[in-house]
Each structure stands twice: as C-alpha cells, then as structure tokens.
C-alpha cells in the first residue's frame, strides 16, 4: 500500500514516478482519514518547541499550523522516523508531526492533537502489484500519456475521452526525464473496465499520442 494523493496537499508525485520506473500496477485504492499530532519528549511544553520534523506530505497538510506556531519544518522520510528522531534526540525544543500510535511506541507526549489544517484530511492509498491484476468491479483506470510537443496534441487525447463519454476525474502533468520542459500526463478515468467504450479507448488512444502506459484498472474500497 502506497499513498498516492491527499485531499489537502495533492498528489504524492514520487510514488507515481516510482511506479513508472519499476512498472507497477494499481489493483485497488482506498481512502483513509489522516490526523496529525504534535509529539515531543515527556515534560516538554508547546512553548519550548522551535523545530518540527515530519514527512513532506504531513508538513504540507499542517502548513498553516506550522506557520501560526512559528515553527521551522524539517523533512524526514516518514512520520514514524520523525517520532523516533525526536525520541532519540537530546534536545527539548524539537517535536514531530506523527500519529498517537507513534507517541505510544516511542514514549512521547502528545502536546496537541489533530493539528492538520483541514478536519476532512483524507489520503488515498493504492495497493500495487508487479504483475497486472484486474479484479471484478474495476471501474477506474490510471494511464500515463505522452503527447508530441506541439499545439493541439493534448486536445486530441482529450477529444477521445469526450467522444466516448468517459469522465476524467484527475489529470496532472509530470516532467519527462531527460526532456527539458516536456511533460507526461497522468489520467484517472471513470469507466468500467468491461465497458465497450473502455475497450475502444484502449484500442485507439495510441492514434492520438506518442506513448500510452496502462497503470491499472481498479475499484476504490471505502
């Protein structure tokens, strides 16, 4: 399971890049409510805190809180590592943005609860697989599409979806490695994998683009 998108901070682009590099496929997605807490060593007060450590996504999701508190953010690999680094530190002016479970695991105090900027803070996680697996009920598909670097080429791709009445629920660009200021496009589309429209799309999309990579069809588990 890997985080691919957050309702506050947007896409986790590094995960998409890793999927492309290692040829993984999405087989399921699910949404999880995410709460962040300010953790520090026992006996530390909020007023003592100057520096806060966490994953980049957690820092982005708590950006307003960090600014209001006048804290200096530091990015680490994940929220659990942030909690451990605070627990292992000799300093009493550092804190972590992490879970209450990590507070218990590493013997930290919860100075403030639920400090994310939005109460409705959800992260979408993808279950990925090296071999391609499509399970019954799959009604969403992720694609990576590269178009020629000239006017109208992206429009031709979008026209394919429009002509087949396939809803695009997400569209984002990412730089193409080794090609300055050229971009690939990630699409999430809403269409049952068994629908004739989907089969037509996959059979003809290559006519409108330079490259189309199929990242998987899946359903979202709520």
Predicted regions and their residues:
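Domain-level signature for soluble enzymes in the chorismate/prephenate branch of the shikimate pathway
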Residues: 1-222
């Amino acid at each position: 399971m890997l985080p691919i998108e957050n309702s506050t901070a947007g896409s986790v682009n590094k995960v998409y890049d890793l999927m492309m590099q290692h040829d993984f496929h999405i087989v399921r997605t699910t949404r999880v409510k995410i709460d962040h807490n300010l953790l520090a060593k026992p006996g530390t007060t909020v007023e003592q805190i100057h520096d806060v450590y966490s994953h980049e996504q957690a820092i982005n999701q708590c950006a307003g809180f960090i600014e209001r508190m006048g804290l200096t953010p530091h990015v680490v690999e994940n929220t659990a590592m942030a909690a451990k680094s605070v627990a292992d530190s000799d300093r009493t002016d550092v804190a972590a943005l992490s879970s209450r479970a990590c507070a218990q695991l590493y013997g930290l105090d919860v100075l403030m609860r639920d400090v994310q900027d939005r109460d409705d803070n959800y992260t979408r996680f993808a279950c990925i697989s090296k071999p391609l697996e499509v399970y019954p009920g799959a009604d969403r598909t992720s694609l990576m599409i590269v178009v020629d670097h000239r006017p109208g080429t992206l429009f031709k791709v979008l026209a394919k979806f429009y002509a087949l009445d396939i809803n695009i629920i997400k569209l984002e660009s990412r730089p193409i490695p080794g090609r300055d200021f050229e971009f690939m496009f990630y699409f999430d589309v809403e269409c049952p994998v068994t629908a004739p429209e989907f089969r037509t799309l996959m059979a003809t999309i290559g006519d409108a683009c330079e490259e189309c990579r199929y990242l998987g069809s899946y359903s979202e588990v709520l």
